[in-house]
């Protein structure tokens, strides 16, 4: 179908861009050729490990030879997705999974490098690394549709950070609301993307109310 074809073309383009930036990364021609142009089936084992990690269960990732530091994940201040490639998750990942990890890692690199986003909000947004990675693995429309619920939530969070209030009480309210939404996603998200849509609706309503009260 046209939509699936567009998504495959997007992934191929992203792959080429990443290969240009990272010459050592092998070409993964299987993307366009897999299953006659279809995406490979979801790697259930990888998803299970990510869900456990999202919920704070890092035991399966702390093994000999793994450089993954689970303590960094709860802090949200470091891009742990780069380390994830060297963990059991990365070793179990197929080519599509590995590329998805790289692309989502690049997305969070932009967030962490944005000097306009306060560190306290970066730390909260950073805790969404694993849920967002799961979304990207579950639904490739995450990359091709700006209206995707998870992308809209990230965009709204970034815009809220740009409008970070001068007054401490307004900062505290936004911080508390974002933390509430992040914790809810961490606790409840498995495969139902509606949790991101609900969080987006609630955040927009909160921001409109804050604007009304300003």
Where are these regions (language model features)?
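Extended, low-complexity, amphipathic alpha-helical coiled-coil/linker regions that act as scaffolds
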Residues: 1-214
